[in-house]
Design a protein with these regions (language model features):
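Glycine-biased, small-residue-rich flexible motifs in mid-sequence functional cores and linkers
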Residues: 1-169
Length: 169
């Protein structure tokens, strides 16, 4: 799930990071992940897509064209599973571990408390990675953001100044 505002923030963030020569790593999920990758490509950047199954099984299927474009634009797709491995639910959580492990930090646009993004955050905390989130008022789609903010566990970015301060964390 991702709001229209979250989609725009994700796209703009991906584009900005690409223009600053920062690679974007995510799991090709629908919503914020997809928009961040599209923005990164539009900005001339490189994307790394982490798959929860074998490289022959792009999930969600609707992102097949995006996955192809990532590879054609000098990005890559990574899986820890052999070709032909069908996806199982636990593999999504393992994918979240890889997303964090391959990243310098984790940026949360919108995350519900019970979401894959929160798995990625937990792995990032255990790996001593930088974690930041955007602050916005869409409580129903950003309850995970709020929880982390209230616990004082992350840097909170304001929309307008957030992108510049992100690279200074």
């Amino acid at each position: 799930k991702c709001s229209l505002k979250g989609r725009k923030i994700s796209y703009d963030t991906g584009k900005y990071l690409a223009e600053k020569n920062v690679n974007v790593v995510n799991g090709l999920a629908l919503g914020c992940d997809t928009e961040a990758l599209k923005g990164t490509i539009a900005g001339g950047g490189r994307c790394i897509g982490i798959l929860p199954a074998g490289l022959d099984d792009i999930l969600p299927k609707s992102n097949q064209k995006l996955a192809d474009e990532i590879v054609m634009k000098d990005g890559c797709l990574i899986s820890e599973y052999p070709v032909g491995t069908p996806v199982k639910k636990y593999q999504y959580v393992r994918r979240d571990r890889l997303q964090s492990g391959l990243s310098d930090g984790v940026l949360i646009v919108e995350a519900e408390e019970q979401s894959g993004t929160m798995h990625t955050v937990e792995f990032a905390q255990n790996q001593y990675k930088r974690i930041a989130c955007y602050y916005h008022k869409l409580v129903e789609l950003s309850s995970g953001n709020r929880k982390l903010e209230e616990a004082g566990q992350i840097s909170v970015l304001k929309i307008k100044k957030g992108l510049k301060s992100l690279l200074k964390l």
